[in-house]
């Protein structure tokens, strides 16, 4: 059993006789109090989808649930459901559009390194790779010779995600995006 300070995002835990998936963790250090840090965790019940915010002390022990990961690829959209296919055994995993709204902004047919997290065989979340490559569909014209400048401009990508990019980037270019920070990393390697 890990301590609360050792638990990471997208971990499944058992809490109050239910299984929750941790979606966000905020660390705080109370002023004027002896003791350690506090970890406020935003969790979602795997069975019902209901949200729970709970604060744990850093040294509080947490029970982990049986969580497994399956490498998948995005397959197709069926109404409000997004369907992902297991790369190893072709098992389809269905997700409601609302339950993966944040992840959808980084996913297209070419996205590699996606994983479905399952608890007791039930899909509960999509885990994104550290970075993805997406195409810019709308941005201001590029400025020649602006590579030495640190100024940025907004760009809309093929999935609808909006990020800040350097001024020398143009429409139609494929770029790498950091999925955790929602930030431009570099131009994608041309193959």
Curated annotation (Swiss-Prot):
SMART domains: EFP (SM01185), Elong-fact-P_C (SM00841)
InterPro entries assigned: Elong-fact-P_C, NA-bd_OB-fold, Rib_uL2_dom2, Transl_elong_fac_P/YeiP, Transl_elong_KOW-like, Transl_elong_p-like_YeiP, Transl_elong_P/YeiP_cen, Transl_elong_P/YeiP_CS
One Gene Ontology molecular-function label: translation elongation factor activity
Tree of life domain: Bacteria
One of the GO BP terms on file: peptide biosynthetic process
Endpoints of the signal sequence: none
CDD domains with a match to the protein in the record: S1_EF-P_repeat_1, S1_EF-P_repeat_2
GO cellular component: cytoplasm
Family: Belongs to the elongation factor P family.
HAMAP family to which the protein is assigned, alphabetical: EFP (MF_00646)
The protein's name: Elongation factor P-like protein
Lineage: Bacteria, Pseudomonadati, Pseudomonadota, Gammaproteobacteria, Alteromonadales
């Amino acid at each position: 059993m890990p301590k609360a300070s050792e638990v990471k995002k997208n971990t499944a835990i058992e809490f109050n006789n239910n299984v929750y998936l941790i979606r966000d963790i905020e660390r705080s250090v109370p002023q004027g109090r002896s003791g350690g840090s506090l970890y406020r965790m935003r969790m979602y019940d795997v069975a019902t989808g209901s949200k729970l915010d709970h604060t744990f002390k850093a040294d509080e022990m947490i029970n982990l649930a049986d969580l497994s990961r399956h490498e998948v690829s995005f397959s197709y959209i069926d109404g409000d459901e997004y369907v992902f296919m297991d790369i190893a055994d072709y098992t389809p995993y269905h997700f409601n559009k609302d339950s993966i709204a944040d992840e959808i902004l980084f996913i297209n047919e070419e996205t590699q390194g996606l994983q479905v997290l399952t608890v007791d065989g039930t899909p509960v979340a999509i885990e994104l790779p550290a970075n993805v490559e997406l195409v810019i569909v709308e941005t201001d014209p590029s400025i020649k010779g602006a590579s030495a400048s640190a100024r940025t401009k907004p760009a809309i990508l093929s999935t609808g995600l909006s990020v800040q990019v350097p001024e020398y980037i143009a429409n139609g270019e494929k770029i790498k995006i950091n999925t955790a920070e929602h930030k431009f990393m570099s131009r994608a390697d041309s193959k």
